[in-house]
Amino acid sequence: MIGRIAGVLLEKNPPHLLIDCNGVGYEVDVPMSTFYNLPGTGEKVVLLTQMIVREDAHLLYGFLTPQERSTFRELLKITGIGARMALAVLSGMSVQELSQTVTMQDAARLTRVPGIGKKTAERLLLELKGKLGADLGAMAGAASQSDHASDILNALLALGYSEKEGLAAIKNVPAGTGVSEGIKLALKALSKA
């Protein structure tokens, strides 16, 4: 499986990207929330990915934050929700908005996402209840400890640490800490673990 991709962004054509990794171009689909936060073409980009293998294709979906990827994975577990629909949900609302929608059981908000009708919205609310809020709350709490949490996490992932280890280490980084200092503090926390 491909869990992370780092390279030069060659093409941006919503929701498709082409990323050059040492001479190999990977096509990656991303939600619009990720797309709007990408650097310009010709610049370096790092994405967390979910690879889906089908009979007729191997597909990569990319995300800037661990929260987006874990939410995408939760959506895929729901009967009747495929990768395209999960991508549409994450393009139609942020992870925090989805969490609030599930908490408030707001089916009407979900039906505003293209392709989601009333029954699908109700099934999403039912199956995500309790799962999404707890996971997102823990991850968002860890990530919000630092203004540069996603940059620090990406650096830790590049050094070979797991997402779980990285999120745990970020908890030790005070809010407002710069990226380089945050990486040092996170590595120090990981060395003690």
UniProtKB/Swiss-Prot annotation:
Region ranges (Flexible linker): 139-143
Protein's cellular compartments: Cytoplasm
Superkingdom classification of source: Bacteria
Keyword terms of this UniProt record: Cytoplasm, DNA damage, DNA recombination, DNA repair, DNA-binding
GO BP terms: DNA recombination; DNA repair
Record-linked HAMAP family: DNA_HJ_migration_RuvA
Identification of the protein by name: Holliday junction branch migration complex subunit RuvA
Organism: Paraburkholderia phymatum (strain DSM 17167 / CIP 108236 / LMG 21445 / STM815)
Annotated gene: ruvA
